[in-house]
UniProtKB/Swiss-Prot annotation:
Sorted UniProt keywords: 4Fe-4S, Iron, Iron-sulfur, Isoprene biosynthesis, Metal-binding, Oxidoreductase
Record's cofactor remark: Binds 1 [4Fe-4S] cluster.
Protein name: 4-hydroxy-3-methylbut-2-en-1-yl diphosphate synthase (flavodoxin)
Cofactor or coenzyme needed: [4Fe-4S] cluster
Residues the entry annotates as binding [4Fe-4S] cluster: 270, 273, 305, 312
Native organism: Ectopseudomonas mendocina (strain ymp) (Pseudomonas mendocina)
GO annotation (BP), single: isopentenyl diphosphate biosynthetic process, methylerythritol 4-phosphate pathway
Lineage of the organism: Bacteria, Pseudomonadati, Pseudomonadota, Gammaproteobacteria, Pseudomonadales
Main enzyme class: oxidoreductase
Pathway stated in the Swiss-Prot or TrEMBL entry: Isoprenoid biosynthesis; isopentenyl diphosphate biosynthesis via DXP pathway; isopentenyl diphosphate from 1-deoxy-D-xylulose 5-phosphate: step 5/6
Encoding gene (name): ispG
UniProt cross-references to InterPro entries, sorted A to Z: Dihydropteroate_synth-like_sf, IspG_bac, IspG_bac-typ, NO2/SO3_Rdtase_4Fe4S_sf
PANTHER family assigned: 4-HYDROXY-3-METHYLBUT-2-EN-1-YL DIPHOSPHATE SYNTHASE, 4-HYDROXY-3-METHYLBUT-2-EN-1-YL DIPHOSPHATE SYNTHASE (FERREDOXIN), CHLOROPLASTIC
Highest taxon of source: Bacteria
Amino acid sequence: MHCESPIKRRLSRKIWVGSVPVGGDAPIAVQSMTNTDTNDVAATVAQIRRLEDAGADIVRVSVPDMDAAEAFGRIKQQVRVPLVADIHFDYQIALRVAELGVDCLRINPGNIGREDRVKAVVEAARDKGIPIRIGVNAGSLEKDLQKKYGEPTPAALVESALRHVEHLDRLNFPDFKVSVKASDVFMAVEAYRLLAKQIEQPLHLGITEAGGLRSGTVKSAVGLGMLLAEGIGDTIRISLAADPVEEIKVGFDILKSLRLRSRGINFIACPSCSRQNFDVVKTMNELESRVEDLLVPLDVAVIGCVVNGPGEAKEAHIGLTGGSPNNLVYIDGKPASKLTNENLVDELEKLIRDKAAEKAAADAAVIVRS
């Protein structure tokens, strides 16, 4: 039951991606990207719906050619979450998906082409009320910047971004967000720090090509955590070579750890030792999988013994501390009941679900009164 985050967020301009606000005082949005063949409409729709169920605020879809653009239009009609079309090389694809109802256009300045092509995309976006993401990536910098800097650097990433920010400014188009991604944590972090000082637009954070589920999670948590703790960032994407649903889970876990956004159960659990009165690892693994469908924010402490157990349990909505002969349960900081190891997970799940329902009803009542 912790207080609000002490982080003071950078004040940015608010834009709208479909129905989702990004920037300003809006919650930090969590994004993912499909990894299906966009031309396989059924598979892509199915994956997007799984991402919706996992809590994705925005989903990006790669649109590599005109056939994929037509497929994108059919996909858009079958999902609820706002969709971003990821466009490279052919600006005409961006023009087509704008006609088909895209919620945001992501273009890469390094490969979209001449300024007149960027202007055409901007005018299409303006006509349809569609925001743009300028997506700069260390792996696809413009050739003149590669020659100037010799290799990708934070300064090169920022220079690439700023030249296209200035272009959109000249076209009087303010509704855009910017990313300056790299697979190197230090390069990405420094680029975002530099850029945050120079523009007012919202920033989309990510460590690109971060890696597999474990290594990518660690790299993203370190890089994005550094920036978010400094108040930088308005929307995030965790790039993992894994099921995209895992990106949403990790994204929300990062935000929860910084108290920037609460969604679902925040578990506090000990690593366990010989003092444990129940199998903490087994209990946690089973409990996490059972209640991952819950969206109500709750703190749940699962501590194996009485050394730190009572202290942690008292600070949670629901706390379990191991003890002999029985384990003690705290509800809202007060001792409530005792549980044996038999059916422990079943009993905890019921307590968590009951508490979640109670909190959801209380929150709804507050909204009605206000």
